[in-house]
Design a protein with these regions (language model features):
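Sec-dependent signal peptide recognition
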Residues: 1-2
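C-terminal motif of bacterial Sec signal peptides marking the signal peptidase cleavage site
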Residues: 5-8
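N-terminal mature-domain "stem" immediately C-terminal to a signal peptide or N-terminal signal-anchor/transmembrane
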Residues: 10-81
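Acidic/His-rich structured neighborhood in mature extracellular/periplasmic domains
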Residues: 79-197
């Protein structure tokens, strides 16, 4: 279970996924936004993505493309280049098809968040998102958003996994572990926040 933890002080998306503890959690579909851009790249879409995901784009660049591009000068060309590979684009489409509807996960996470707020005063889940990493990091953690890489949860028998992952690794790469891994990432980030320097 791999986590990239990038603690940031400002907002990573423009809007909160929810305003109250009892409101339904909505998973932010960063994966769909990036796919939409890749299908028809434009400077307008680049500006929209930078405005909507100011810090998350940088974290995603470090995870998916192993870049430290803080000014975005190479981010979008690198992104287009990475996903120009037919196999990676097929994996991207497979993930989008598998997670076209994420309401079952949102319902489970909403129930978990209700439990958290009732039993742990002042605690709640942050914003939650999905991205595609190209089989890199499972999870990106910022101080107010946790995102999982949907392409790492396509089922233990997913054909493309067999070339890259051992059977014991593939057992964890199933849709039934999506909610578990969101919650695990949140718990680990809370431990980091609470631990003394």
């Amino acid at each position: 279970f791999m986590i990239v933890s990038l603690i940031a002080c400002s907002s990573t998306t423009k809007k909160d996924a929810y305003n109250t503890e009892t409101e339904k959690i909505t998973i932010i579909r960063f994966d769909k936004d990036i796919y939409n851009y890749l299908q028809n790249p434009s400077e307008v879409k680049e500006s929209e993505l930078k405005e909507k995901y100011p810090l998350f784009l940088q974290a995603y660049g470090r995870v998916a493309m192993i870049t430290d591009d803080n000014d975005f000068s190479g981010f979008f060309p690198d992104l287009r280049d990475k996903f120009s590979h037919p196999l990676l684009m097929q994996i991207y489409r497979d993930a989008l098809n598998t997670y076209e509807d994420v309401s079952v996960y949102e319902n489970e996470l909403t129930a978990a968040n209700t439990f958290i707020s009732e039993h742990f005063a002042g605690r709640k889940l942050p914003q939650l998102a999905m991205h595609i990493s190209g089989f890199r990091q499972n999870v990106i953690v910022l101080n107010n958003i946790i995102s999982i890489s949907a392409d790492k949860y396509l089922g233990s028998e997913y054909a493309q996994y067999k070339e890259f992952f051992q059977p014991y690794e593939r057992q964890q790469m199933q849709p039934k572990f999506v909610v578990r891994d969101y919650l695990r990432a949140w718990l680990m980030s809370e431990i980091v926040k609470d631990s003394p320097d």
